[in-house]
Every structure is written in C-alpha cells, then in structure tokens.
C-alpha cells in the first residue's frame, strides 16, 4: 500500500517526553494564556498547551469543558480573544485556518464536513488545494489509506456516516499535515468502524503530531501517550495517559462512579 506522507529532508524528529517542545529550535505548536468567552461565560482559560512533533496528545473532560473550543483555536476556525499561539517558533495567533492548513496544521470536525455536490475524490482534492504542486497520487493515497479508494467516483452525499468520517480524515491527510487535530473522530461509529479507524490512525507516521478530543477512554488509551483533562475550561490535570486514567479524581470528575463501565459513555 502506498503511503500518503513522505519524510522531508530533515528526517524524523528525535524522541522526547510527550508535550515537551524542542524549545531550542522552536519546533511544535505552543498556546500560551488562551482565554475564550461567549458573552459573560468563560469557556476556556488555559495557561499553556504544547504539542511537539510526534506527540499523541488527548484532551478529555466533561461536556462543556472547553475541548472543542481549544481545538478550534488551534486550527484557527475560532479567532483568539486572548493569548498567543506559535507554530515552529512563528506567531500564528492572527492567522486564519487556510494559512494554518498550508503551514501544516490539519483537522477533522466533530460533524464531518463534505461537499455533497462533489465526488469523494474531488472532496479530497479540495483538502490539498493549498499545495499548488501536489501530485495527483496524494489524494488517491489518502483515500487508499482510509479504505475509500473504491468510492473515489461516488458522490460524497451518498456516503454513510462512517464513510463520511473516513472521508473527513482523508481530506485532512491530503493536506499533508505536521499536526493533525481530531475532534471526536469515533462519534457515531460502529464498533467495526471504530476498530478500523484506530488501525488507520495507528499507522500514521511517527513524526506527525496528533491532538485528539475524545470521550471514549478506550480510544484515548489506544492512541494517546499523554492526556490533558479540562474542567470548566481550565486544566484539571495532565500526564501520561495510563496515570491519568488511574487517577481517582479524574474518575470522579469525568468517568463518574461507574468504574470501567463509565469509560464507554
């Protein structure tokens, strides 16, 4: 199977602790002092959030904790009200989503966005529009990776919810991101589709950073090395995923008192 991505000349980033930015070279995505409010309601108040090349970083928390707001601010789909965001040492706080996509920050959406009047292949081509010299094989490789190569000429509107999720991922991958932001990628998927998606995400290149907003703890455990817990827009705790999952305070806050059964809610 062909791969969507290629290692560029500087090679694979060296190993580091999750969330530890290579500050000597300014590599990574760094948000500082982010604060966002809707009217009088503050939905996010975060001191720092860092993503280094190759990180697998989950963001969890109850509904309304500010998870999707954080992702939208990182992607540029929501304008930053307060705070700064840098990417590889460059200030991007005022840059919009198209600029960030060109720079290497891709994303999927909580509700998959497709162009219903386009074919599946044309939707993926749209995902890589900012790469002016992108070879035709890149959209095809993205479809191949997510298992939709046989649907390339289908109208996007004809896809099932599960296939739309895969298409949303293919669109993001066609942009050849360095940082991939995933907003509840398994929401509404069957167990079979969830397993398939986990396999796909597990085969992404090691240099690609993944930030995952997710409610399903078994998905978080499978994908993320590092987990940040948000509550009322603030950082409740963070650390290695296994440690966070075992924290009784996190269980009480997020999983409830139902133990392992609650992890599937």
Give the role of each language-model region.
Residues 2-265:
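Glycine-rich phosphate-binding loops of nucleotide-dependent enzymes
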